[in-house]
Amino acid sequence: MRQLRILGIVGSPHVKGLTSELVAEALGGAASLGPGTETVSLAEQGIIHCDDDHSECWSDGVCRRSEAATALSRKLDEFDAVVLGAPVYYLDVNGLTKNFMDTTRTLNTNGKPALGISLAGGTGKGLTSTLRSIYNFFFCIELRGIDPLPVSRFNYKKALSQAYSSGRKLAELCKRRQPFESLSERIAYYHGLKYLNYDIVDENLLLAQQLIQNIEASGDAKALLEEAIREYSEAKELVGQGKKTEAVVHIMNSYEAGTKAWDIQNH
């Protein structure tokens, strides 16, 4: 019986950075159930931008500008599942990842399971908008995306555990590939995935939540955490009432108090 294989793609320019660690954790979870794994770092591939000048690439899967792009497309065709991790630049995927996406021309990916991970350093902003870009890519090449994973410095440790669990789930799912039968089925499936319908208000509320859930504060940080929790609760109630615009000030108050508490706790 052929061994199943899962491909990990690291979109960060840092070959051994935090994005790489998250992808490695997901592959480790998959490997624990038997599949083989392989990691590709986009920083080492030299994939250049698409010039949209060779329409035949859509039918034959060959990029005329980049052999590396063609080789990676064939890996996506050959492997049984994929993990794609990307850092956040300007609330979106970085250029390395975007060049990879734009030059991908797959011929055999319908229904293969895929896990996307976004990593937003610093403020954490862009963690769900970047996930949306990753899963839009999965949608376009007919992968069956699972478990969108938004990661910031505030939930990084927990995210490693989530990545491992999702990797195990990938290993199980790739045993029984489920191709989409129609475009309408694919749209309905992706519409139901968590985080993909988040707007900028939802995203910042999520960041405030990540802060609150991952701070164990004492001293000066404790009062700030309590303030963050109060403001978050007010924001959550307003969002639930459909008053997102009114909620924004409370979301940002919660976030600002939470980040101050975080910085005190971690320095």
Regions found by a protein language model. Give the residues of each.
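Short helix-terminating capping/connector loops at secondary-structure junctions
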Residues: 1, 109-110
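N-terminal beta1-alpha1-beta2 submodule of the flavodoxin-like/Rossmannoid cofactor-binding fold
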Residues: 1-101, 164, 170-171, 175, ...
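A mobile, often basic/glycine-rich helix-loop segment
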Residues: 102-106
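Phosphate/oxyanion-binding loops and surfaces in catalytic or ligand/nucleic-acid-binding neighborhoods
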Residues: 107, 141, 173
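Short, glycine-/small-residue-rich phosphate/pyrophosphate-handling segment
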Residues: 110-162
